[in-house]
Amino acid sequence: ETVLSELGPEEGAALCAALDTEPPVSVRLNPAKCAGAAEPGAVQDGTGAAPGGYGSPQGSSGTDVPAPLPVLQNADGRVPWCADGYYLAVRPQFTFDSDFHAGAYYVQEASSQFVGRLMGGEGVAGKRILDLCAAPGGKTTLYASLAGPDGLVVANEIDRRRAQVLADNVRKWGTGNVAVTTCEPRQLGDFEAWFDMVAVDAPCSGEGMFRKDAQARAEWSEGNVKL
């Protein structure tokens, strides 16, 4: 009712219909664990070679390499703005995939992978990045891949329960260039001008969950957003 009243019957109905469609599934490969994936600094502009070795049937040289990740046997095209991003035709049971638990890839919406393209123009490799609202860690792991071994990502999450999930995902990703903190943002103000980049994916209205979770729609209200 709120959507229809705010957008009108035509646009409102179109939005409601879109929210009822199955969201596309996409994953992002881990360059540190998939041989031939994009090098640090190439992920954000789509110039990295097609992932090979552990990640695809052919290496960047075109020679035969070990079998691809099983999850990519279900690939349904590349994510245009992320060299390591792939759409999947159907959603597999990720919890049963050892590659998922080993951090060989991260399940992440293609729209979230676009942040790498936004940051890419600044030259991310070797930079110090503060991810201020980091849990559960999807963007943190992307920043870690972009920064490379000479960079540093400080992933901050004030909610300690969510910070544990963040730490688990960072550990699986395995790049070794991420520090997880649970500071109040004002505490990090003491590091003025120390970071090269600050990323803030702030808590918001939650509308991005509407397509994934019917309960999120049922619980949404202007009052909850203001909270």
Predicted regions and their residues:
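S-adenosylmethionine
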Residues: 1-227
